[in-house]
């Protein structure tokens, strides 16, 4: 499953989401909307109003959401850690 986290500079919830995903062994791509303004426009058009926005397969959400992160399946090396 492909996971993308849309972030911005100095975003506390973005950093918390990144740390939570890393601690569970997920691989993901990060897109900084401060550097990619078109990404911010696309997210707004999709109804997102807060960062981070996480897109993981058919799931997507905004904000730091440990409950949603826990719904994802970790990679095998994290499950054995």
UniProtKB/Swiss-Prot annotation:
Which keywords belong to this entry? Disulfide bond, Electron transport, Redox-active center, Transport
Keyword Protein transport listed: no
Spell out the disulfide connections: 11-14
Highest taxon of source: Bacteria
What Gene Ontology biological process does one annotation of this record name? cell redox homeostasis
Q: Which GO terms describe its molecular function?
A: electron transfer activity
Q: Which residues form the Glutaredoxin domain?
A: 1-81
Q: What does this protein do?
A: Electron transport system for the ribonucleotide reductase system NrdEF.
Q: Of which family is this protein a member? A: Belongs to the glutaredoxin family.
Q: What is this protein called?
A: Glutaredoxin-like protein NrdH
Q: Please report the organism this UniProt entry assigns to the protein.
A: Salmonella typhimurium (strain LT2 / SGSC1412 / ATCC 700720)
